[in-house]
Amino acid sequence: MTMITDSLAVVLQRRDWENPGVTQLNRLAAHPPFASWRNSEEARTDRPSQQLRSLNGEWRFAWFPAPEAVPESWLECDLPEADTVVVPSNWQMHGYDAPIYTNVTYPITVNPPFVPTENPTGCYSLTFNVDESWLQEGQTRIIFDGVNSAFHLWCNGRWVGYGQDSRLPSEFDLSAFLRAGENRLAVMVLRWSDGSYLEDQDMWRMSGIFRDVSLLHKPTTQISDFHVATRFNDDFSRAVLEAEVQMCGELRDYLRVTVSLWQGETQVASGTAPFGGEIIDERGGYADRVTLRLNVENPKLWSAEIPNLYRAVVELHTADGTLIEAEACDVGFREVRIENGLLLLNGKPLLIRGVNRHEHHPLHGQVMDEQTMVQDILLMKQNNFNAVRCSHYPNHPLWYTLCDRYGLYVVDEANIETHGMVPMNRLTDDPRWLPAMSERVTRMVQRDRNHPSVIIWSLGNESGHGANHDALYRWIKSVDPSRPVQYEGGGADTTATDIICPMYARVDEDQPFPAVPKWSIKKWLSLPGETRPLILCEYAHAMGNSLGGFAKYWQAFRQYPRLQGGFVWDWVDQSLIKYDENGNPWSAYGGDFGDTPNDRQFCMNGLVFADRTPHPALTEAKHQQQFFQFRLSGQTIEVTSEYLFRHSDNELLHWMVALDGKPLASGEVPLDVAPQGKQLIELPELPQPESAGQLWLTVRVVQPNATAWSEAGHISAWQQWRLAENLSVTLPAASHAIPHLTTSEMDFCIELGNKRWQFNRQSGFLSQMWIGDKKQLLTPLRDQFTRAPLDNDIGVSEATRIDPNAWVERWKAAGHYQAEAALLQCTADTLADAVLITTAHAWQHQGKTLFISRKTYRIDGSGQMAITVDVEVASDTPHPARIGLNCQLAQVAERVNWLGLGPQENYPDRLTAACFDRWDLPLSDMYTPYVFPSENGLRCGTRELNYGPHQWRGDFQFNISRYSQQQLMETSHRHLLHAEEGTWLNIDGFHMGIGGDDSWSPSVSAEFQLSAGRYHYQLVWCQK
């Protein structure tokens, strides 16, 4: 044990937080989570241990701008200015200094290992009592599961130790410091330490005791570590559970270890042995260790699909059977290996349906509770995710237990990121930083290696490639050869990774960056000598309205076996709740706390909002990742299961044939598909509709029974095919009514019954419509070529740093947002049964024509207005965001009804999950409340739209809401939007894709850009 003087002054003088060689003082060795049961039955059933006591709750807290400002008296008693805060928590969420959001840039001046003298410091204290029996015998430990970023600990005025690495436990022996009666803990937490240079992750920078604190009482002679692993024969019919147990304390000949394996209440195997390890070298073996091997016949294998778990109980006892203590863990029998270029689980090639997950809560910051963790897992499972990457640090220890039990594959990642260094490997190639890096990797492995859900270790994130990585890679491979290691830094395919694990590599497009090229994922596989599997550690940047082109990745994954999936970036928007002057909550992002530097809304890349409400993109991910694939041939549906281990024992296939959303026939067939098997389903003779319309076949896989992660009726997969389009020629009903045209100097006015249409001859636009005496328009019907920029359109561009390559900057520079219409033609003709208005406009900016739009409006005796639009795009202007029409309707109706793709928001490059049907939703549901407002709510493939008294027919895309594109473009946060008068309608003949391969470079694939020179579309507008 390191002994230093107890005084605060000496601790401050040492400045351990600016010494990369000092990562801890007096911290105990890492190990799996302990409970020290004194009853083996309680260990087997995982009941709360009487030896484990939570210290979570109210602590006293005082904040200081720097550690030097902390008075020495605080070690002995609480300060007058001390407040009460809840532990665990981040102190910024209680109003003490500010959270800082940055992606790459360090939030402090880069001068490792030194940190600013203005180093916010939180002083926590707690008084508590311990059981008298704990003082008389054994060892009492205190466990801090997570403290950001470094801390010193005192107990009863005496210095205990020091710890850093905010994402792994720091555990100390308190036995020598405790006394009878009341005890007092004092914890001085520093916001910045040399460890902060290794924690430059893309997240909010927050501080404090943000994970659980507990006391653990162990006997003097105790289990100090245990490690379980499973081995198999070739066909997995026989297994061996290897359990290596280590003890500390007085080694006696009468000590024994028993390891028993349980399946529920049934003991599967058991073994007992004295201590004394196998011979290691010429000096012998470990006297304080023993390895037991238990044979298991026909083990039930663990996978994310079927997370079968056993329970291993490790007992330390005397020769006569007297129990000293027991530890336990869940055991999953599974094997991970790479063979023939494939990542295999239990001999089957995995397809990783993964997502990156930060630990984030909108109210509690980086504090995770069990309810939120379970909610995340259920949502992931319900949306066909089978894997999660702990980005970019070891998670709360409970997370792994839950992943074991519910079934998720985990990439466990070391808390190392030096993204803001230039070059990135400045620290990771420096031997002075090897001890700090080593502790972050080795302690992660020692804590988490008993979890079957952990199938891959990661050396960290975005830290370049240095010699320290190579050393730690070799250490892991030596200590735990049962799992592969991945690491993206330095090019994603270095010697420090078993898996090619790029981030944001594209399917077919190379990105030849100097030194670290990102090849297309297809090309990467074929590089000379390359035999490893490829799994994208990050892809499909889901920032705001994004995930365009996701289907392209999944086509490639299913086509090329060594492309074994990836991890979407990322799971949850990292917005935080703030309150306005009236106490109303709103969602904040970088800069909203006065934090500098900051990276604005770049913290919001989630498939779900911070409150776990899904983004529309989540449905696209669910559909592309679904475990059942379908092929239609004639009357036969071929269903293919992508489950590797699960037989379809809880699935029904519902099928329905509908004509323009009207059901004509339906049925239900139980699915009986073996893992990786197929089932052919013969449909009956389908009805032949007599009326016109599109005939669609829709299949949905429904789970009739609830599961551990889904309710009864859960839909896990679906597909839709258009069978036919019945065409009919319907002659207009004979009408003696003929629209009447009136011409004035200013307008063309057409009247028919109680309806009127007014075209302004000076502007050439439809300026007003009346039904009776009620005006229908608040703004004219005009061409529209722009959209409120998406995050993907903006990229890295900002006011102080313009990226001319970003779509929005190209559109601005070309004048798309500022273009004004010059009237070229506006004429009216009376036909035999209709009035025809013909217009032409040149949309210009600074004298340059960007678009020419020609329209005809044909208003017939039935009151229908048929609109035909032809648009020419200048060859030297950027591809436009949309080609469509826009107006502000006077009505605000409660509901929107349409025949087209839905129900969720969809875009041309993100619509595979949408189904063609007749949909009816509240107007409010047509708007997607992205925290950073942008273009949203589009519905593609629309043949009919009904809103209020109006109906539109044709083949178009639309969005409709209370917010104009202008307001969306000019507003920084969704809570600042105000419902405008009437309703804004955008009807597009064509709309550019949204992209999403990444969010900092133009990522809309060429096939989804509006690159043609001419466009033509038609629609009919009438009143019901």
UniProtKB/Swiss-Prot annotation:
Q: Which GO terms describe its biological process?
A: lactose catabolic process
Summarize what activates or inhibits it.
Inhibited by phenylethyl thio-beta-D-galactoside (PETG), isopropyl thio-beta-D-galactoside (IPTG), L-ribose, D-galactonolactone, lactose and 2-amino-D-galactose.
What does the record note about the cofactor? Binds 2 magnesium ions per monomer. Can also use manganese.
Q: Where do the annotations place substrate binding?
A: 103, 202, 462, 538-541, 605, 1000
Task: Identify the InterPro entries for this entry.
Answer: B-gal_small/dom_5, Bact_Beta-galactosidase, Beta-gal/glucu_dom_sf, Gal_mutarotase_sf_dom, Galactose-bd-like_sf, GH-type_carb-bd, Glyco_hydro_2, Glyco_hydro_2_AS
The active site is formed by: 462 (proton donor), 538 (nucleophile)
Cofactor(s) it depends on: Mg(2+); Mn(2+); Na(+)
Give the site residues for Transition state stabilizer: 358, 392
Q: Per UniProt, which keywords does this protein have?
A: Glycosidase, Hydrolase, Magnesium, Manganese, Metal-binding, Sodium
For the site labelled Important for ensuring that an appropriate proportion of lactose is converted to allolactose, the residues are 1000
Q: Binding residues for Mg(2+) 2, per the UniProt record?
A: 598
Q: Which reaction does it catalyse?
A: Hydrolysis of terminal non-reducing beta-D-galactose residues in beta-D-galactosides
Q: Which residues bind Na(+)?
A: 202, 602, 605
**Impact when changing residue 602 to A:** Decreases the stability of the loop 794-804
Source organism, top-level taxon? Bacteria
User: What induces or represses expression of this protein, per its UniProt record?
Assistant: By allolactose.
Q: Does the keyword Manganese apply?
A: yes
User: What are the recorded GO MF terms, alphabetically?
Assistant: alkali metal ion binding; beta-galactosidase activity; carbohydrate binding; identical protein binding; magnesium ion binding
Q: Which SMART domains match?
A: Bgal_small_N
Q: Which residues bind Mg(2+) 1?
A: 417, 419, 462
Presence of the UniProt keyword Manganese in the record: yes
Family, as annotated: Belongs to the glycosyl hydrolase 2 family.
Protein name per Swiss-Prot or TrEMBL:
Beta-galactosidase
- State the organism's lineage: Bacteria, Pseudomonadati, Pseudomonadota, Gammaproteobacteria, Enterobacterales
The protein's gene is named: lacZ
